[in-house]
Amino acid sequence: AILAGIVLDTKSFTLRTGDRTFDAAAYLRRAGADTVAVKKLMQNGMEQTVAKYKILQRAQLYRSMAVAVPETPQNRIVAAQAADELLNVAGVDASMVMYPTEDGGVFVSARSIGDVNVQLIMEKLGGGGNRAAAAAQINGLTLKQAVEKLYAAIDEYIDS
C-alpha cells in the first residue's frame, strides 16, 4: 500500500521525485512490495476507461494547452485522469477538462507539467490548487460562457 501511494503521489515517479523517493521505493521492493499488485490496484474498470477516452476525443489545443469540453456531466476522478493523460501529448504544457455538473454548474480540472502554473489560471475562475493540479467550480454560467471565461483566463495568464 505504501508503494502504491508513492506511485500515485509522484504520478509514476515523474513529479515531486527525488533521491529519497527512489530510495524508499527500492527499500519497499526489497522488503517484498509487489509491483504487479500496485499496477492492478491502479487499474480502472472498462466503463471508466471508455469514459476517459471519450473525454480525450473532445480535446483541442489552445495556446499549448489541451482543453477538453465534454457536454455532459462527468465523474470527477475520470475527468482528472483525462486531464493527466492529456499531458502525455507532445507540446502540451497544461490541460483542462471542463464539463457541466448535475446541479447546473460547471467544473474544470486542470493539470500541468513544466512552467505553466494552473493554480493561477484556476484562481481567475474562482478556484485554486497548486502549480501542477488545480480545479474550479463555476456557478451561474452556461458551459459555453464558462469555456469563454477559461480561454480569457488562459490568455490573461500567458499575456501577462
Map each language-model feature to its residues.
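Hydrophobic helix-and-loop "lid/oligomerization" segment in the mid-to-C-terminal part
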Residues: 3, 8-124, 129-160
